[in-house]
């Protein structure tokens, strides 16, 4: 395509001269909005079909338009299409090439349409498609976590608060916590799809059009539930993009938390897991190193995704109705966040699937830090009838004694414990073992292996219907 066809020829009837070079540079978006080519062509074909069906253009012109657009689609996908920055964006690049191919009939395509509703429908279609991709990726990650949870439903590990050993849990239970988080992310994706499932096409510049168009027809042709009900809203808001970015930011934050734990667990000091070579790198100077770079990059890229949400919120916060060129800044945020999230989900699914779990190291760590202290307090309440606050105090004294003797709680003698409360009997030792502590947590959603397996069965059924 020749640069002789400038943007000035598309909208420049009232201008005496073309834009300055710097204006063309700052105004052009083709370097990134070319990603919308498939959606742009899809929307244009649906629009042309509606124009013909309502008698606004002839069937002959519509057939030429559709044939030309399909030719352009093939050119772009083959890599032979010549994009021009002087034509600003994907819409005008496609329209200019269409004019090259079919002549004056191309000029009828933009009847009853503005670039304002055109870009709104293009981006909405793209984001909707991306939401479906994210949903599938999330299902893959949840499946990987469920497999790990099932494998390690009874594998004991320490549960932490403030990064201090708090109570014993199972690794399966820990994995299921992330299943719940990512399942909510999946729900957020679906909620976003539901809200964005309306077509802005036909709103034209902002006020609608005097042509007898059929917006319901184009909405259906493009796979939307219905057309948007207000033409001003149709072209002026980007909350569907913000919905996507908010979902992406929350999901990325969940991924980052899991990545942080993987990084910690894979250190020699913890030794809970070993990442596969496929998701690790080495050092250029230290030959012994095996670095958890995939997890670190997931953690690092979260800031990038979160930044895109804040960036677009900031763009939109001062926008009066309806359209302003500020909105051109929506696309790079969305495109980069989507690409980044796709990578993060794929990397995390791979790490979870391939990592080796060191159950022995987890079990050993689970007994440290007096992790069964709460079990001791609960036993005092159940067996001796102590108020919980008094039981908490007695247990605290037992912990202090254990630390003084440099032993774990279960290594204290019965005499030691009776020196704190004479009512304590030898039965206390059954609750101080970490395995028994875990088995006793049978409340709904608890860490007992029996309860973890119930939750695994529940989510497997839910996922099968998803």
UniProtKB/Swiss-Prot annotation:
GO terms for cellular component: cytosol
Molecular function in Gene Ontology: argininosuccinate lyase activity
KW rRNA processing (keyword) present: no
Entry keyword set: Amino-acid biosynthesis, Arginine biosynthesis, Cytoplasm, Lyase
The EC number(s) this enzyme carries: 4.3.2.1
GO BP of this protein: arginine biosynthetic process via ornithine; L-arginine biosynthetic process
Keyword Metal-binding recorded: no
Gene3D superfamilies linked: Fumarase/aspartase (C-terminal domain), Fumarase/aspartase (Central domain), Fumarase/aspartase (N-terminal domain)
Pfam assignment, any one: ASL_C2
Known pathway: Amino-acid biosynthesis; L-arginine biosynthesis; L-arginine from L-ornithine and carbamoyl phosphate: step 3/3
Domain of life of the organism encoding this protein: Bacteria
Cell compartments where the protein resides: Cytoplasm
Catalytic activity: 2-(N(omega)-L-arginino)succinate = fumarate + L-arginine
UniProt cross-references to InterPro entries, sorted A to Z: Arg_succ_lyase_C (IPR029419), Argininosuccinate_lyase (IPR009049), Fumarase/histidase_N (IPR024083), Fumarate_lyase_CS (IPR020557), Fumarate_lyase_fam (IPR000362), Fumarate_lyase_N (IPR022761), L-Aspartase-like (IPR008948)
TM helices/strands, residue ranges: none
SUPFAM superfamilies: L-aspartase-like
NCBIfam families named in the record: argH
PANTHER family: ARGININOSUCCINATE LYASE (PTHR43814:SF1)
Sequence similarity: Belongs to the lyase 1 family. Argininosuccinate lyase subfamily.
UniProt name for this protein: Argininosuccinate lyase 1
